[in-house]
Design a protein with these regions (language model features):
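Hydrophobic transmembrane alpha-helices and immediately adjacent juxtamembrane helices
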Residues: 1-158, 162-271
Length: 271
């Protein structure tokens, strides 16, 4: 009997610690790992800030003001909430895809965890929770930068942080679900092919109204567009009932991603 099999035999005689307790152990494991890899973690803070400085102020100097909901705002104020949503997406999606795939296929981290009272459900939720935490930290730092650059147009802008957490939750759930289908590193080329158009065409840099009517419907199916619409409404101080379907859509995709993740992880990890 191997050491892993012996550990599983012992595990069978130990009471599970619960899904929430187990998922917190998964998050704790990632925190421990990134104590040594903190430069890799910190570099993720800079990308959205560079976009904000380069596009928000660079191109913004050429564009000037833009009209949104009857308000005239600077281009930097317009684009900043969208870049914050993108920061939440990127922070969550890359850890929940590349990181999860590596731990599933090569490091066998989750198999080792299952030799303890941690369950498959805990592993799935913990992987998502860690990705959400990372995306949320990126968003929080970005929000501070927005405040320092005086790009917070309304006191409601502070509510962009919980909206960013929801965005991270959505993309972390979808990312972990997608990662369970990945067979090799080459498959991530397809994922990047999806993420780049999402970033460029989800009304990140211009209003959705520039698209023809049929294309607007397609863009509205993008989860990043829903996140941007939600966060831009808050950032510009223009709350409306259109935020309700945005939240509902993101929650629905989060639930779908969690369900697929749980099913796939159960299939791959259950001994």
């Amino acid at each position: 009997m191997t050491a892993l099999e012996e550990a599983r035999a012992v595990r069978g005689r130990v009471a599970p610690i619960g899904v929430i307790g187990g998922s917190s152990r998964v998050v704790e494991h990632n925190l421990y790992v990134y104590r040594r890899l903190w430069p890799m973690f910190v570099t993720g803070f800079f990308e959205p800030v560079f976009y904000l400085l380069g596009i928000g102020f660079g191109i913004g100097g050429l564009v000037g003001t833009i009209t949104v909901g009857g308000q005239h705002v600077s281009y930097g104020v317009f684009v900043a909430p969208a870049l914050m949503a993108s920061a939440a997406m990127n922070g969550a999606i890359y850890d929940s895809t590349f990181g999860l795939f590596y731990q599933l296929k090569y490091a066998k981290t989750y198999e080792a965890m299952l030799a303890t009272p941690v369950t498959v459900g805990s592993v799935s939720l913990g992987a998502v929770a860690w990705a959400v935490l990372r995306g949320s930290l990126y968003s929080a730092v970005f929000l501070v930068v927005m405040a320092l650059l005086r790009l917070l147009h309304s006191p409601l802008g502070i509510l962009m942080l919980p909206a960013a957490i929801l965005t991270g939750f959505t993309f972390a759930s979808l990312g972990t679900a997608a990662a369970t289908f990945v067979r090799s590193w080459d498959d991530f080329d397809l994922m990047n092919l999806i993420l780049l158009p999402l970033f460029l065409f989800s009304a990140t840099f211009f209003p959705i109204t520039i698209y023809p009517g049929a294309l607007q419907i397609v863009v509205e199916l993008s989860p990043l567009y829903r996140a941007i619409d939600l966060m831009r409404s808050l950032g510009l101080g223009q709350p409306s009932w259109s935020m309700v379907p945005d939240v509902a859509y993101l929650l629905a995709l989060s639930g779908l991603g969690l369900w697929v993740t749980s099913r796939r992880m159960m299939k791959r990890l259950r001994p």
